[in-house]
Structures are given as C-alpha cells and as structure tokens.
Amino acid sequence: MSIINTSYVEITTFFLVGMPGLEYAHIWISIPICSMYLIAILGNGTILFIIKTEPSLHEPMYYFLSMLAMSDLGLSLSSLPTVLSIFLFNAPEISSNACFAQEFFIHGFSVLESSVLLIMSFDRFLAIHNPLRYTSILTTVRVAQIGIVFSFKSMLLVLPFPFTLRNLRYCKKNQLSHSYCLHQDVMKLACSDNRIDVIYGFFGALCLMVDFILIAVSYTLILKTVLGIASKKEQLKALNTCVSHICAVIIFYLPIINLAVVHRFARHVSPLINVLMANVLLLVPPLTNPIVYCVKTKQIRVRVVAKLCQRKI
C-alpha cells in the first residue's frame, strides 16, 4: 500500500468503498442489495417483454416506457459488477480503464433516462393538449427517430468523460467514495490540472438541469390545459395519466439533487451517508419505476397478471 500511495508512482488501480464502518456485515448487506438488483432487472425485463408481445401496447406512450425500462436496465447492469465484487467477494479493486468505462456507461444511461423522462413529459402534454392529432404526430417511425436521436445525444454527451479522465495523472490517492465509479469522484483524485474535467462535468450537470426545467415547463402547460377542461371528472382523468411519470421524475431527480448538494456543500458528511445516497441514486429508480407503472397503468397491470395466470395454468 505504501507504493500505491507514493506521489512518485502513477496509480492504475482504484479502490471502491462498500459500507464504511460496516465491512464486517458486507455479506449480509449483499442480500437486500442483490435482491433489489434482481427485482429491478426482472421488473424492467417484464415491462419490455409485455410491451413487445402485446400489439395493443404498440403506442407512443408505451414505446417511451420501453425506452425508460431499457435505460433502467442499463443503469442496473452498469453498476452491478463492482457492487457485487465489493459486497459478495470483498474485492474493491478496479483498474483505471475499467473504472473509466464504468463511469461512461453509468453517466450515459443516466443522461439517457433524463432524456426519456423529458420525451415522456412532452408525450403527456401532446396527448392531453391535442388528443385528436396525437397518433398522427407521434407515428411509430417518428418515435423510433426520437429514440435514436436522444440515445446518440446521451452517449455523445458523456463520450469525452473517459478520455479526459484518462489524460489525468493519479499519484496521491486511489480511494473512491462510492461502490462504483463516478466522473466527479474520480477527477478529485487527480494530481494534474483537472479544470477541463470540472468545466465539462458542470456542462453535463447543466444539461440534466435543462431537461428538468423543460419537464417542469411541460407540466405547467399540462396543468394550464387541464384547468381549461370544463368537467372535473375529465380533469382528474387527464391528470391521472401523468401520475406514473411524475413519480418517475421525482424518483430520478431527487437523489441526483441530494447527492449534488452533499458533494458541493456538505463535504464533511459521514462517508456512510455518502455511499447510501449514491446507491439510492442507481438502485431506486430502476427498482421502483416498473412497480409504479405496473400499479398505476391498468393496461400494463392487466397484461402482467394475465401472463402470470397463463404460466400457472
């Protein structure tokens, strides 16, 4: 360890953190964590399977929901290897190249999820504001084009991350703050000038903030449209179609905002709190989104139950 921490030796291996102070209980902590990953993967896989196999769900809203499920699957699978290696096998080491690759996929799928939530907010606005032209505007081809464009946009946005991190020198510390690699966490360990990473990281965070602002704008327009509907029953019916999406937005953005505030203003907070919040960031959205959409979306719920009943028969 003395060689690794020497300032004259460039670091090529990082050490991730499990639960600080609870290392003795990692094997027991792995049980709920592995269960959450399993439920998230099965839940999002089920959403994708139901939408693919049910022709009646081949509509814009459900295509966008399948995009959300794919981004959730990507988030889960990106962090899964290091989390399992720490809690199951007590192996916190990760090579620098593997770390840079992991942070690319984690940030890429996070940006993609933010983009999908933005698309879904405009989808809900269009469905409520102009229902007669909804299907003619959002055709299958146009939905596919939107999905491809936003996927490329998400990956291109984070593509510089691993290359800028790779150009930095790491020669003092090699202990990261989480169970997986994040851009802002890795760049803090650099002993060379990391201003480019700081600026580009801020730009990436700004893009997420723009998505959030546009989602808020779309819901302001939705609320304005709903208030213009004469019937209270129709107002509630229109708003009810947005509940699942609003829950998904809160579940995704709230942990990001909390973690950003902690990193920026509460630097002396307990490392355990830091790790817990970071794990919530990647575990909770993929875990809860399928549950929320199955519970609140009748079309999904009915078909999931029907598939389960068929298997029992």
Curated annotation (Swiss-Prot):
UniProt key word tRNA processing: no
CC annotations in GO: plasma membrane
Cytoplasmic face of the membrane: 49-56, 123-141, 219-238, 296-313
Cell compartments where the protein resides: Cell membrane
Residue numbers on the Extracellular membrane side: 1-27, 78-101, 163-198, 260-274
Disulfide bond annotation, renumbered to this chain: 99-191
Residues carrying covalently attached carbohydrate according to the record: 5
Key words of the record: Cell membrane, Disulfide bond, G-protein coupled receptor, Glycoprotein, Membrane, Olfaction, Receptor, Sensory transduction, Transducer, Transmembrane, Transmembrane helix
Membrane topology category: Multi-pass membrane protein
A molecular-function term among this protein's GO annotations: olfactory receptor activity
Entry superkingdom: Eukaryota
Main location: membrane
InterPro entries listed in its UniProt record: GPCR_Rhodpsn (IPR000276), GPCR_Rhodpsn_7TM (IPR017452), Olfact_rcpt (IPR000725), OR51/52/56-like (IPR050402)
Transmembrane regions: 28-48, 57-77, 102-122, 142-162, 199-218, 239-259, 275-295
Role of this protein: Odorant receptor.
Protein name: Olfactory receptor 51A4
Species classification: Eukaryota, Metazoa, Chordata, Craniata, Vertebrata
